[in-house]
Amino acid sequence: MHLSPQEKDKLLIFSAALLAERRLDRGLKLNYPETIAFLSFQVLEGARDGKSVSQLMSEGTTWLTKSQVMEGIPEMVDEVQIEAVFPDGTKLVTIHNPIN
């Protein structure tokens, strides 16, 4: 299988996000890499589902709460940026203060 660097990055994000989802399901708190992967995956899948940039920016602040991440993570993650493919091209999605 021949994958571009971007495709490899997306697979890595997917793997880490899947691990994060499973840990959340078990009641475990996410660490920094798991948090970033989880949020990034939600953006990538939302774009694939046809959601707009503004929808994802708005919804992005509801995906995780402070009780779902380890202490100090909300302060470390004040912004998440990820490029996602939309029907009209690739766009940068920025979520400010994603953990409430």
UniProtKB/Swiss-Prot annotation:
Pathway: Nitrogen metabolism; urea degradation; CO(2) and NH(3) from urea (urease route): step 1/1. GO terms for cellular component: cytoplasm. It catalyses: urea + 2 H2O + H(+) = hydrogencarbonate + 2 NH4(+). It is an enzyme of class 3 (hydrolase). Its main location: cytoplasm. The keyword Cytoplasm applies. One of its GO terms (biological process) is urea catabolic process. Its EC number is 3.5.1.5. It is found in: Cytoplasm. GO terms for molecular function: nickel cation binding; urease activity. Keywords: Cytoplasm, Hydrolase. It comes from the Bacteria. It holds the Pfam family Urease_gamma. Belongs to the urease gamma subunit family. Heterotrimer of UreA (gamma), UreB (beta) and UreC (alpha) subunits. Three heterotrimers associate to form the active enzyme. NCBIfam families: PRK13241.1 (NF009712), urease_gam (TIGR00193). This is Urease subunit gamma. The lineage of its organism: Bacteria, Bacillati, Cyanobacteriota, Cyanophyceae, Synechococcales.
